[in-house]
């Protein structure tokens, strides 16, 4: 288990990658490298640049999903700093604060930490979400055949747990209690 400072360091590392919906190759290379570094058994990239990661051998896997792009521009002088417990990014060329791409880099970080901490897990990382869910709409459905449940961590804040989709309750109290340790 990583310490709080180590977790912050890995989050800063992920936030330091830059990606837009049209320029995300560096982030993809970083994610593939990290996946193997964290013990992934298989990493596959489809024709839509979605990344599929499998670790372990299970009849049924938990799955975590995120997306690889952000709405922010790419800056040559981009650097992430921690200030009073918050991560901020600055472009040294313009000397202005810029976005960190927390949407969905925090989701990518969660995926990597789940990969680090679980022996059997699947992860799907979708491309071009910010321009209309391009990658996820073309997802390889067979990747999910042996997935028991999936988490998506693309949320504002941390005070809620979405249990409904389009007015449909997705699971009950028993499931929520079972996944609480995660």
Model-derived features: positions:
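Acidic/His- and Gly-rich active-site-bordering loop/insert found
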Residues: 4-90
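Polar low-complexity intrinsically disordered regions
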Residues: 1, 37, 177-182
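Alpha-helical hydrophobic/aromatic positions enriched in membrane-embedded helices and signal peptides
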Residues: 10, 59, 95-96, 146
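Acidic/histidine-rich catalytic neighborhood of metal-dependent amide-processing enzymes
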Residues: 96-100, 104-181
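Mixed-charge, polar/low-complexity N-terminal
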Residues: 1-3, 131-132
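Short acidic, glycine/Ser/Thr-rich loop/turn "cap" segments at secondary-structure junctions
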Residues: 86-100
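N-terminal catalytic or cofactor-binding beta/alpha core of small enzyme domains
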Residues: 2, 16, 60-64, 76, ...
């Amino acid at each position: 288990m990583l310490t709080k400072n180590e977790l912050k360091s890995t989050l800063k590392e992920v936030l330091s990658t830059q990606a837009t919906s049209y320029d995300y190759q560096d982030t993809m290379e970083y994610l593939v490298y990290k996946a193997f570094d964290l013990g992934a058994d298989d990493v596959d990239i489809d024709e839509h640049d979605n990344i599929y990661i499998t670790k372990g051998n299970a009849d049924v896997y938990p799955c975590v999903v995120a997306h690889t792009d952000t709405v922010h521009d790419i800056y040559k002088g981009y650097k992430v700093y921690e200030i009073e417990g918050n991560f901020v990014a600055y472009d040294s060329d313009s000397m202005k604060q810029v976005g960190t791409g927390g949407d969905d880099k925090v989701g990518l970080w969660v995926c990597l930490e789940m990969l680090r901490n679980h022996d059997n897990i699947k992860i799907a990382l979708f491309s071009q979400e910010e321009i209309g869910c391009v990658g996820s709409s073309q997802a390889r459905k067979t990747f999910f055949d042996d997935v028991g449940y999936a988490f998506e961590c693309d949320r504002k804040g941390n005070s809620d747990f979405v249990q409904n989709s389009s007015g449909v309750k997705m699971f009950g109290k028993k499931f929520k209690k079972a996944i609480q340790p995660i």
